[in-house]
């Protein structure tokens, strides 16, 4: 037994001894190599590693193909969902579950997205948002522009939570606030809706920060919405929030075409 061990040591430790000549040769080659050439090789390797890392990030991003349509009940998101997929008008009703379908975007790359229409009912919307948010490439928050004045507090409450959740994701989604029902005479403009939402969200974050903290020290503090000590603006967020106007129903009612061209362009841009 002892003689066998002695032979193993003499041979260079088995498998290690087999590769030792190659390692010695490599070491000698590196020592004899021109330092300039060695620097070039190291630089090329660094570039290759960077490209591999970038490709991994891109593939992770490309695997997120979901676009979440969220909003209050009767905001018109389900009709938007139908219009994007079929171009046709259809009577819709409040749903208690999600609907999803593949959407081919209108660009020269032939990309596709998965549209997911989430329920707008107060008791369900956060539950479904939690289920799908990690797969979101983009979030389209649909607002009823005609009913906005009376719903502004409810809209801001839900939007506050959606923004906080989006900021906490590893891959921050693209974010759009679609001001729907612009065909109605009393509809508010996207600019006015943005201004009023900024005021409401500013009030909300003040009241939320003043609320007593939990006794559970293990719980993490919620993300800060905007810059502390300044009036809230969407431009302060780490994600870009865009606004546009649209009309899922269209100016001619049930028989007319929808005014969603800007929304289609936005989806093509983020696909």
Swiss-Prot record:
The protein, known as: Signal recognition particle receptor subunit beta
InterPro entries in the cross-refs: P-loop_NTPase, Small_GTPase_ARF, SRP_receptor_beta_su
GO biological process, one term: SRP-dependent cotranslational protein targeting to membrane, signal sequence recognition
Residues found modified as Phosphoserine: 112
Coiled-coil annotated residue ranges, if any: none
GO molecular function, one term: GTP binding
Quaternary structure (record): Heterodimer with SRPRA.
SUPFAM superfamilies (UniProt xref): P-loop containing nucleoside triphosphate hydrolases
Transmembrane segments: 37-57
Top-level taxon: Eukaryota
Principal location: endoplasmic reticulum
Binding site for GTP: 71-79, 92-95, 120, 248
